[in-house]
Structures are given as C-alpha cells and as structure tokens.
Amino acid sequence: MQQPEQKALPAHSLKVCRGAVQCPHAVLGQDIGAELETVLAHSGWAEFLTGRVHPLRHHHQFRIAVSSCPNGCSQPHIADFALIAAARIGLAQERCSGCGQCTLACAENALSLQDGIHLDQSRCLGCAACARICPEDALFVEQTGYRVLLGGKLGRHPRLAHELGFFTLPQALGILERVLRVLMEQYRPGLRLGDLIEQMSRKKFDIKVGP
C-alpha cells in the first residue's frame, strides 16, 4: 500500500508562550510572531535551507522561542534564537515607606531596604513583580524590552543559550536578521547556531550580530 505523502517541514519553528494572550506574569503581552516571521521571510532562510538539505528534519530547523516573562515557558534557553520580555525597574526613593513587600515579591533576592531601596541589577531578571506589588509606586517600570538569547540546543552536545543583552523590539529584530545572515554565510550540513558560536567564539559572534 502506498504511504501517504508527508507534509514538508518548514525551515524554522516558532514557539510563543501563552503570555502573548493571557498570563498574570507577562511583562509584555504583545504577540510579535508576525514581526519575526517577516524577518525570516525577508532573510531567504527557507529557500537557503531547503536548497541544501533533503529531506528536512526537525533538527535542521532554526528554532525561535518567545517568552513573555523570565519563567521561560517556551523553553528559550534551548532555542537557536530567543526573546524574553523584561522590564527595567526605576526607583523613587522618596516614595518608599519601607513596607518590604517588594523584597518578599522578588524571587531573585535582588532588593534590599537598608537605608532606602537598593536594586542589584546583576540579580534582577526584569520580571517586574516588585513594581506590580509596590503600594507607593516607589518601584516602577522604566522601560520594557527583550533579553536576546542565542545558540541554545539539545542533542548530543547540548548548549544553553547565552544572553546578548537587553534590547528594544526593533533592535532584537535586527539582531535576528544578522544572525541568519552569518549562519548562512558559514553554513554546512548539520551545523547548528550554537556550534557556530563556539567555533567563532562567543565574543566575536556577539560583535558580529550586535546592534
């Protein structure tokens, strides 16, 4: 009996958490899937990959993940390219009543209340839980954007994605465009982005794709 023809896989996968629709933890609730798809379409990645790999399997796909908060339900740390919505927190010392609700809300222990509010930026993941709970608006969202992660993968030699930095959406889309261009320039069958980053060195790769 003739086997039914299998539907061809796309050259990329895009995984978006439900925060784009509804989630109490979402830092940004906007659905940016269309913007990412536009960058992918203009890059020529689909034509490039399908012209070189037959048949196309899941491990050949360029994997993108979008998470609306640091909880990472879309598994951004194992994607080739990922965006995690984040907030930069502003401080208004004069409004602080010293109630301590922010320190209890912070899962990263990034806040302390000795002689005013102190925020340890090296620990803060930008979840904005402190700003949401502060009754005096002493902590507030100063800016929202995305943490850009690059080169995550599982498989035989797994690699957690490394973080490039905090960027606006237009900046992040520009980074995706450059990442795809560099990957196509250096591509060979079986090469994943994480492998390329390790070969080039993270520092050189980040300089090449950064804004």
List PLM regions with ranges.
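Small-residue-enriched alpha-helical segments and adjacent helix-cap loops
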Residues: M1-A105, H118-G126
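Short, surface-exposed, polar/charged, turn-prone segments marking secondary-structure boundaries
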Residues: S43-W45, G90-R95, A110-S112, T168, ...
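Flexible, glycine/charged-enriched surface loops at secondary-structure junctions
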Residues: W45-L56, Q114, E185-Q199
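Active-site-proximal loop/turn and secondary-structure-junction residues that shape catalytic pockets
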Residues: P70, A110, L154
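Iron-sulfur cluster-binding cysteine motifs and their immediate structural context
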Residues: H77-D80, Q101-H118, A129-Y146
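Flanking helices and flexible, charged tails adjoining ferredoxin-like Fe-S electron-transfer domains
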Residues: R123-P211
